[in-house]
């Protein structure tokens, strides 16, 4: 194992990160994370560490749908190198006295993590290469990535359809209204699945969408035969020593190509009662969830209803 990561040079970062996405096709497991905003000042600097992290190939992995967190803790304790992975929606059934009957279409486990063969990441304007295996040649890996020929960007016209039929949707809305009348909830998010059967290149689609979204928490994740594409504006959790940070977001508005029009839109969003209500709701929800395991009086809301763009 290397004592320290190796500093490497990348001469065209935009091209390199695109090629890295296509390079992931060679491996069954890979995780590529993008911060996207190189000069972003909207997030506190303390909360942003990396511009990108690319992890390739699995040397060890773990997946579980029972006792997942205990198994993960043992896995983390056993291996000292980086770990990458995900928790799926149904993990909630293990930690809360609740359950759902949603169909697990892709047979995704409650938890999956892997130790990569090597990683490439950018931090504080410097790019690094790291691996547990000192025989892995960083120059060879970089040469392989740089040798990839970039494809001409494709235009996508995907037709998504909701998997829920209209009568069932209206029935669910009436149930929600009854919950609100009875005081069981005062506000909630009702999520539905949309799908398409069109064949696409996931790597092409990720790069095309990522260029448009430029979300600060974007990810391209490969797991067995599954590819997960995520473009999120919010952070679920970040751990710094004994401090946990969550940055949920609610309330959105369209963006304009005109700077002055954008200022008006920001002002409208800041004054929107609906969006303020949603933002306060999700902040209160996260605060309550963190309070379950946090030391008393340590959960603090550092910022509320600030607009990020």
Regions inferred by a protein language model and the residue ranges of each:
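Extended alpha-helical targeting/anchoring segments
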Residues: 1-309
């Amino acid at each position: 194992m290397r004592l320290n990561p190796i500093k490497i040079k990348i001469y065209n970062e935009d091209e390199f990160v695109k090629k890295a996405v296509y390079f992931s096709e060679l491996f069954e497991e890979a995780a590529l994370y993008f911060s996207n905003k190189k000069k972003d000042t909207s997030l506190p600097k303390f909360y942003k560490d990396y511009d990108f992290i690319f992890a390739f190939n699995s040397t060890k992995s773990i997946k579980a749908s029972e006792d997942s967190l205990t198994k993960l803790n043992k896995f983390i304790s056993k291996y000292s190198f980086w770990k990458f992975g995900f928790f799926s929606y149904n993990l909630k059934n293990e930690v809360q006295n609740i359950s759902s009957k949603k169909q697990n279409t892709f047979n995704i486990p409650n938890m999956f993590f892997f130790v990569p063969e090597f990683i490439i990441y950018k931090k504080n304007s410097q790019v690094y290469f790291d691996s547990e295996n000192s025989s892995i040649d960083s120059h060879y890996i970089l040469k392989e990535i740089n040798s990839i020929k970039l494809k001409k960007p494709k235009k996508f016209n995907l037709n998504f359809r909701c998997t829920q039929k209209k009568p069932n949707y209206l029935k669910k809305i009436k149930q929600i209204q009854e919950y609100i009348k009875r005081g069981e909830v005062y506000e909630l998010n009702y999520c539905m699945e949309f799908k398409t059967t069109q064949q696409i290149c996931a790597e092409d689609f990720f790069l095309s969408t990522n260029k448009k979204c430029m979300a600060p928490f974007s990810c391209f994740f490969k797991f067995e035969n599954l590819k997960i594409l995520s473009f999120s504006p919010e952070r679920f959790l970040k751990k710094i020593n004994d401090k946990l940070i969550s940055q949920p977001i609610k309330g959105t508005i369209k963006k304009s190509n005109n700077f002055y029009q954008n200022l008006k839109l920001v002002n409208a969003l800041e004054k929107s009662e609906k969006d303020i209500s949603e933002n306060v709701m999700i902040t209160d929800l996260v605060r309550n969830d963190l309070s379950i395991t946090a030391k008393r009086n340590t959960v603090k809301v550092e910022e509320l209803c600030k607009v990020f763009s």
